[in-house]
Amino acid sequence: MSEQKLPLKISDLLSMTFPQNSFWIEPAILPKGGTLLFGGAAKTGKSFIMLELARALSTGTRPFSSSIFSVPGKAKVLVIEQELGERESQSRYSNLLKNTRPSAYNDYLYNLSKVPSMQLNSNEGLKYLYDAIDHVQPNVVILDPISMFHGFDENSNTEIGDLFKRLEKIKGAFSHLSLSLILSHHFKKPSVGPYKTDTLSPYNFSGSQRWFNTPDTLATFHRGKTLKDKSGWFLDSRWIPRMGKQLDDITFLIRPEDEDCQVQVHSGGGDKDGTCGPTTLGATSASSKLPFVVSREREREREID
């Protein structure tokens, strides 16, 4: 039988002390040992936001070079994605993290692409994830999209509850790393009718209510207008941390082919600058179907036109 927690006296609870630095991303966006869930329709640009968070964590710099968010210190990040593959992942990292010094941030950013056997409803799939984490020893793992990491019924509270329990066990096994998870999940198809809907509501998550009841923080996204020159689009977002104050809605500007600034804050959230700032990346292969390290460093000093 696993070790069970016992009830605490309130006096003992009140006397407990907690570390000051309890979050990988502030303000209260990604708790150490917690879970952040992204949500939105396909092709909105969620992956660009996730990669920017990975960049910021692995380099210890502000996400989006924005005054809204901060990273108290560097964290080792493992990105596991099921859709792009290594060729497209290389292209995205290369575009996002131009002008690299390959040795600048070695051992802080890793990628693992297209591992269909990593199915968390099976013991073999769980072991695959465990082994990948054990190989890298990351502080943060990104699973994108979570729907391709399991064979559970996404509409079942029981089965999705089981999925989150399995993820909690994984985090518990690496508690010495303060392991946190960032997951991406899809929204259900928008309803058709005369009434205007809240496109950023967490109730838009497809499937079981466990998707939006269980994580520590929810981040929802909706694609806005495309730029006139077709070079990018606006991306509305809402960040809902359970451990802190909800931010004002934030709109990002996504420019996938812009080598100087792929993602930046356009408006909202109380941002004081919204410019692009320092970033970097390069990649060297480690071993077949084990995560490989991604290193980066570059200068970005460009404001939105």
Predicted segments with their positions:
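Conserved inter-motif catalytic segment of the P-loop NTP-binding fold
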Residues: 71-158, 165
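The Walker A/P-loop phosphate-binding site
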Residues: 2-98, 103
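Residue-level signal for alpha-helix termini/capping positions
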Residues: 59, 134, 172-176
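Short gly/ser/thr-rich secondary-structure transition/capping motifs
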Residues: 16-23, 123-124, 199-203
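Conserved alpha/beta core segments of nucleic-acid transaction machinery
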Residues: 242-305
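Phosphate-binding/switch region of NTP-binding enzymes
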Residues: 37-38, 43, 47-48, 77, ...
